[in-house]
Amino acid sequence: MNFHIVKRENCPLWKKCCFYLGAVAIALLLGAALLSALGVDPVAYYTRMFTMGTIGNKIAYKVWINYLKDFVPLALTSVALSLAFKMRFWNIGGEGQFILGAIAAAFVAFKAGPVMPAAVTLLLMCAAAMVVAGLYGLFVAALKVKFGTNETLMTLMLNYIALYILIFISEDKGEWNFFLDPESLRPVFASFAEIVAFPSIPMAGKFSLNICVILTALVGVLVYIYLKFTKQGYEIAVVGDSAGTARYAGMKVNAIVLRTVFLSAALIGLAAAFKAGTAGILSTSITNDVGWTGIIVAWLSQLNTAVIFVVSALICVLHYGSTVAAATFSQVDSSFANMLQGVILFLVLAADFYTRFRVVMDKKGGNGNGNG
């Protein structure tokens, strides 16, 4: 009796949904088993986590405001990474690009904020962050097209260079370092929240919607249109399928790679500007690991721009909700969400395998055309 893996000719959408939802359900059941072993009621914990403690909470609006502060950079970074991934350029440098974008945005806030109108300063912050992060990504793309370097290793190493630049800024009390609070005896980042900040739009009750949420949604729509309905988006798809075919068709593959990677990194810089402009201060943990989590979100979404927003929202619920739940259930650490996220990723990848392939079992001497 032999087993064979056979590629599926097609898999109906309803069946794909069943596979993916089943994978998530199994992950939640495994999490429930662990919670039970710790003496925690899984239903109570999951209710607390997925509602983020908003039920019966008089300050629930603050929970949603803080939740959106986490959602915006993750969603935008994931969308940005998907651009490069569609072209099979493995941009693992989201963390480094985000850090340098945040530093550039803070630089503009400190230097231009006191002397320019807030709207102009915010635009300059976004532009500076996009240019600096974009050039950081473009550097790797240039090495790739010129010398054939491995972009995965290059972007990974550049993450650490950017991180140590930020750490150096956070620890050096030299007179040049305007990023630090001059009145503090120990190195502490200075706040620029009173100088400039992204405004919020009043909504129902005390809830206010930061303009960055609207801008992120707008960028998502523009990226979707760019990929689906423009010549440049078509070129990205062709290069992703086969660079050789793209060259045979007369496409300038190197230029497409450079342009797309710059755009991908620049959008990560924009996410950093939104984060810095909302927080009003730099920190060594300003990325909140969105560069790494964004890779997971992009792949779970199968590089679909619309699905990226949904998955980002769910991942943020896991992260933010687990922190809220940890305050109630002391037996469970807030890192439970990271474990659950890993299990979900593993099982969804397994489900994705079954949407693309099927396992057939042949009896000895069979012709290998059985159904599975």
Residue ranges and their predicted role:
Residues 1-24, 241, 248-255, 322-372:
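Cytosolic-side transmembrane-helix boundaries in multi-pass membrane proteins
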Residues 10-18, 85-93, 115-119, 123, ...:
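Short loop segments and helix-boundary regions at transmembrane helix junctions
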Residues 14-41:
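N-terminal signal-anchor transmembrane alpha helix
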Residues 33-36, 51-111, 126, 130-149, ...:
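Single transmembrane alpha-helix segments in multi-pass membrane proteins
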Residues 39-44, 85-102, 145-154, 235, ...:
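Short, non-helical or kinked segments that cap or interrupt transmembrane helices
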Residues 159-229, 336, 363, 367:
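Transmembrane helix-bundle core of multi-pass membrane transporters
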Residues 205-281, 305-306:
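Helix-loop-helix "hairpin" substructures at the membrane interface of multi-pass membrane proteins
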Residues 262-342:
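Transmembrane alpha-helical segments in multi-pass inner-membrane proteins
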